[in-house]
UniProtKB/Swiss-Prot annotation:
It comes from Deinococcus deserti (strain DSM 17065 / CIP 109153 / LMG 22923 / VCD115). This is Serine hydroxymethyltransferase. Its EC number is 2.1.2.1. It is found in: Cytoplasm. The modification N6-(pyridoxal phosphate)lysine is found at K229. The lineage of its organism: Bacteria, Thermotogati, Deinococcota, Deinococci, Deinococcales. The gene is glyA. Catalyzes the reversible interconversion of serine and glycine with tetrahydrofolate (THF) serving as the one-carbon carrier. This reaction serves as the major source of one-carbon groups required for the biosynthesis of purines, thymidylate, methionine, and other important biomolecules. Also exhibits THF-independent aldolase activity toward beta-hydroxyamino acids, producing glycine and aldehydes, via a retro-aldol mechanism. One of its GO terms (cellular component) is cytosol. One of its GO terms (biological process) is tetrahydrofolate interconversion.
Length: 407
């Protein structure tokens, strides 16, 4: 490559696709609850020369030389995330939320042990025991469900199942549950049966960091999370605990247990995101995320849609589309055609095939990052409603989205 030749002109195929993706993000409405937009600083750190450095091990205990700088980078990420969540110990090396969960399982329980987690169709996650996932293949899984009338987690049912099955681990956490989680109640039940309480806060980590959702750490033995979603960081995982002995076991499970060299450029980006989340303005952001989700839920109810559990306490809501004669797959296609991105969702006690889902999950982290507030949720609900009814609203979506710049 000559000094005058840029990477974009050398590999036009990839960089043209990157430009197309940037335009897709700019001109559309991103309502996938697990997606967000990072700051330019996060992207710059992730695209830095740190990607060149191999650093098996942990700060001060590496297998390779030349790690004195990345040691400081990783330690800064550790220190910041501990401050953010009030943790005594942290591991910032997991490549994803699922790999963080895998490390927790491998470190703390044995194959064949019983795990009590939220049923996927009721709002849980694949790694909480779904039979197609490692968690469902390696462990004996007992699923708890929401109350059929309130669609809230019924702690009396959780307690009954815990005493009946005596799990080694109880998982508190979800990927499509719109209400606050009572971590204190989960810990009380875990103590009654001698179980480890594992909190998966991947979706609500940013809300917890901002003080807008109860913190899991005073109650859970171990906490894992992604670093994107409501935290607005790069795609990756973290594990936290106030128990240093458990932390040491998990460190060994991450390395050398199942990962080799950590991605220090991603860890640097995590550190930047943690620093941003420690600023006062992040609290304002998290508060607005929730306000927007609640406003969006009300806007859909006003248009005749049923919102699962009747509303939301966090960043997401689930719409039941059965009364509209739609399922998640059909709705996703109609909205995609209008540059509105969402994810299909299963519904509690639904008979629709899990591949299609009876509803859709909507989240407000990304649109809030772009500066949208409650008044704009009415516009979004109107655009979605009309698109679901078969209208072409693509031009309106582009015009509306163009008013809100990406970070």
């Amino acid at each position: 490559m000559t000094t005058a030749e840029s990477p974009a002109t050398r590999d036009t195929a990839i960089f043209d696709l990157i430009r197309q993706e940037a335009e897709r993000q700019r001109s559309g409405l991103e309502l996938i609850a697990s997606e967000n937009f990072t700051s330019a600083a996060v992207r710059e750190a992730q695209g830095s020369v740190l990607t060149n450095k191999y650093a098996e091990g942990y700060p001060g205990k590496r297998w390779y030389g030349g790690c004195e700088i990345v040691d400081q980078v990783e330690q800064l990420a550790i220190d910041r995330v501990k401050e953010l969540f009030g943790a005594a110990w942290a591991n910032v090396q997991p490549h994803s939320g699922s790999s963080a969960n895998l490390a927790v399982y491998n470190a703390l329980i044995e194959p064949g042990d019983t795990v009590l987690g939220m049923d996927l169709s009721h709002g849980g996650h694949l790694t909480h025991g779904n039979p197609v996932n490692f968690s469902g293949l390696r462990y004996k899984i007992v699923g708890y469900q929401v109350n059929p009338e309130t669609e809230l987690i019924d702690m009396n049912v959780v307690r009954r199942l815990a005493h009946e099955h005596r799990p080694k681990m109880i998982i508190a956490g979800a990927s499509a549950y719109s209400r606050s989680i009572d971590f204190a109640a989960f810990r009380e039940i875990a103590d009654e049966v001698g179980a480890i309480l594992f909190a998966d806060i991947a979706h609500i980590a940013g809300l917890i960091a901002a003080g807008e959702h109860p913190n899991a750490l005073p109650h859970a033995h171990v906490v894992a999370s992604t670093t994107h979603k409501t935290l607005r960081g790069p795609r990756g995982g973290i594990i936290l605990s106030n128990d240093l002995e458990l932390g040491a076991k998990i460190d060994r499970a991450v390395f050398p247990g199942y990962q080799g060299g950590p991605l220090e450029h991603v860890i640097a980006a995590k550190a930047v995101a943690f620093g941003e989340a420690l600023r006062p303005e992040f609290k304002d952001y998290a508060r607005q995320v929730i306000r927007n989700a609640q406003a969006l839920a009300i806007a859909f109810q006003q248009r005749g849609y049923r919102v699962v559990s009747g509303g939301t306490d966090n960043h997401l809501l689930v719409l039941d589309l059965r009364a509209q004669g739609l399922n998640g797959t059909k709705a996703t296609k109609r909205l995609d055609a209008n540059h509105i991105t969402i994810s299909k969702s299963t519904l509690p006690y639904d008979t629709e095939k899990i591949l299609h889902g009876g509803g859709i999950r909507l989240g407000t982290p990304a649109v809030t990052t772009r500066g949208m507030t409650e008044e704009h949720m009415q516009v979004i609900a109107d655009l979605i409603d009309r698109a679901l009814k078969g209208e072409d609203v693509q031009a309106e979506v582009h015009d509306f989205a163009g008013r809100f710049p990406l970070p």
